[in-house]
C-alpha cells in the first residue's frame, strides 16, 4: 500500500514540477461553429468575402498545404453556399482529397459538383477526374472503411463508379471509355454466367 502511495505521490510531483504546454486549439466562430487549429499554425486563412476565401484555398492548394486549402474551401461552402465561387470551392475540395489519397471522398466531392452545380465550367474536367479515380480502383486500389482503413477491393463498387460517370455525362467524351471499363470491372469480378 505504501509503495502504491509513493508511486502516486512521485507521479503527481512530476506532473506539477515538469508541466508541459497543453494549449487548447479549438476555436469558435459565431455562425460557423467550432474548428480545430493545430498549435503554432497560422490562423490567418479566414477572409470576409467568398472570392478572397477561394483565393486562399487556391493558393494553399498550389503550395501543397492541403489541410488549409480544405478548411478554406469548406468555409466557402458553409458560409456562402449559393455563391458563384461554390462550385470552384467544391472542386478544390475534391482536388485536395485526391492529393491526400482519399479517392472515395474525392469522387463524392466531384459528384456533388455534378449534382449541385451542373452548369459548372469544370464539368468536363470533373468527369475525367472521376474516371481517373475509378480507374485506380479498377487497378486494385482498396476501398476504405471510415475513410482510413483499407478494407477490400470491390469490382461491383468500381463498376458502380463508372456507371455514375456514364449517367453524369452520357454524351461526353469520357462516357464511351467508362462504358468499356464497366465491362472490364464485371470481367474482373468473375461473377457472370458461363455457357
Regions found by a protein language model. Name each.
Residues 9-17:
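Bacterial N-terminal signal peptides
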Residues 5, 18-20:
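Aromatic (phenylalanine/tyrosine) cluster motif
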Residues 1-9:
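Bacterial N-terminal signal peptides that target proteins for export
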Residues 20-195:
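Acidic, polar-rich low-complexity tracts and alpha-helical solenoid repeat scaffolds
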Amino acid at each position: 500500500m505504501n509503495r502504491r502511495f509513493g508511486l502516486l505521490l512521485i507521479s503527481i510531483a512530476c506532473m506539477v514540477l515538469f508541466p508541459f504546454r497543453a494549449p487548447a486549439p479549438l476555436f469558435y466562430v459565431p455562425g460557423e461553429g467550432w474548428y480545430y487549429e493545430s498549435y503554432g499554425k497560422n490562423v490567418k486563412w479566414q477572409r470576409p468575402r467568398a472570392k478572397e476565401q477561394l483565393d486562399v484555398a487556391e493558393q494553399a492548394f498550389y503550395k501543397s498545404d492541403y489541410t488549409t486549402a480544405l478548411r478554406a474551401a469548406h468555409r466557402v461552402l458553409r458560409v456562402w453556399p449559393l455563391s458563384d465561387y461554390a462550385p470552384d470551392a467544391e472542386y478544390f475540395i475534391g482536388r485536395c482529397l485526391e492529393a491526400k489519397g482519399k479517392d472515395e471522398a474525392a469522387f463524392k466531392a466531384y459528384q456533388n459538383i455534378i449534382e449541385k452545380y451542373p452548369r459548372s465550367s469544370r464539368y468536363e474536367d470533373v468527369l475525367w477526374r472521376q474516371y481517373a479515380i475509378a480507374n485506380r480502383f479498377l487497378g486494385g486500389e482498396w476501398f476504405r472503411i471510415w475513410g482510413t482503413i483499407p478494407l477490400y477491393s470491390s469490382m461491383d463498387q468500381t463498376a458502380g463508379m463508372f456507371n455514375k460517370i456514364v449517367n453524369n455525362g452520357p454524351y461526353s467524351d469520357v462516357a464511351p471509355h467508362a462504358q468499356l471499363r464497366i465491362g472490364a470491372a464485371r470481367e474482373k469480378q468473375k461473377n457472370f454466367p458461363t455457357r
